[in-house]
Amino acid sequence: MGVCFTGSTKTAQAINRLMTQHLPPHIPLIAETGGLNAMIVDSTALLEQAVQDVIISAFQSAGQRCSALRMLYVQQDIAEDFKDMLFGAMRALCIGDPAEAACDIGPVINQASQKKITRYIQERHVLFATIAPETGCFIAPTVLSVTGIQDLPEEIFGPVLHFASFDIKDLDRVIRDINGCGFGLTFGFHSRIDERVQRVISQINVGNLYINRNQIGAVVGSQPFGGHGLSGTGPKAGGPRYVPRFAKQTLLQSAPCKPSKMKAAQVERAFQHQEQTAFSGSKPINLPGPTGELNQYHLTPRQRVLCLGPGAEQLAKRALALGCCAIAADISSEDLSAVPQLDAVVYSGPDARHIRKALSARDGAIVPLLMDETFEIWLMKERSVCIDTTAAGGNAALLAS
């Protein structure tokens, strides 16, 4: 049994709080909640392909996909050429009735959405916009100029793309900025330098990565879909852990051992100490896909796991064995709400409802309360990586014997 939801982060948080009042505390919420999805294009990318993928990712379905591209970074060496090609491609888009075969982009969902997006565009620096029909709930595909993802106040659910150029020496900073926004659903990267691709894959914190292709759409069994942080709780839809999350749980049994009392600041210091030697993850698993496409499934341990209850010490040892940063503590509800960042809480004991309520009152990402005897399964974050191997000159593995 569980609750499954797709929608906004705020609505997911509201559902989580209601669940603490009306359902047993061990019932999971599986939320998939969108995000500020970014793409980076470096100077080695095939511009024609990158432009096509940007058009599809940002404007298809009128930008009304949780996976849609919102923030585009282009290396400054090619930024002007890229903009010329992008704006030219946008001029060719047909906006109108989606029942017409020649139409590329239809309306947004309702007038309220149209008014909100229009007001947002009017308050910002427009680099380029097409022309939309005067009647109906249409929004012209628009590109806005920003300095980076930190300029985006929220997700704008429509055909609006934010554009910024960057110096390649600042690539690590750009990735930190993207990770720092708290969302982590989809991310795209266009580059023909494999070392750089692997570096970005290792640093970016999102659920679904797309290399040298568009970043919308996911195939069940090949690209399990779902985000991290403000973008979702996991497990991924279409992945091996989704259905088992709804199965009946065997709850943890308390052990006669009480952990040390700790304040929020002490818990934070303990996490920071463990993070210096945290395990980065296991070898990726190859998933099926067509020729010219490499699909990989990665499992990485959740970074900050707080273990509570009489058996917290044993629970923490089990979490540490997976590579998590795990702390066993006896902590008040007030201090539990004050710990800056938590990825999961594991608990065995009689106060589960109070703990679930304290966790639901936190701002930011939804923190799962794990009470299952096999809780280790849910301490691993899933990532899907999809690589178009044709973009870098073909699949070199085909040449190997």
Where are these regions (language model features)?
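ALDH superfamily catalytic-core signature
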Residues: 2, 9-149, 169-172, 211, ...
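Short beta-alpha connecting loops at secondary-structure transitions
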Residues: 36-40, 103, 161-163, 225-233
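A structural signal for short, well-ordered beta-strand elements
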Residues: 43, 164-168, 190
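Catalytic cores of nucleotide-enabled group-transfer and carboxylate-activating enzymes in metabolic
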Residues: 52, 59-60, 175-178, 195-205, ...
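Short, conserved phosphate/pyrophosphate- and ester-handling motifs at nucleotide-, phospho-/glycolipid
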Residues: 75, 159, 193
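Phosphate-coordination loops involved in phosphoryl transfer and adenosine-cofactor binding
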Residues: 96, 299-304
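Bilobed periplasmic-binding protein-like "clamshell/Venus-flytrap" ligand-binding domains
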Residues: 126-129, 183-190, 206-213
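Conserved glycine-rich beta-strand-loop-beta hairpin in the small C-terminal domain of fold type I
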Residues: 136-140, 154-161, 181-186
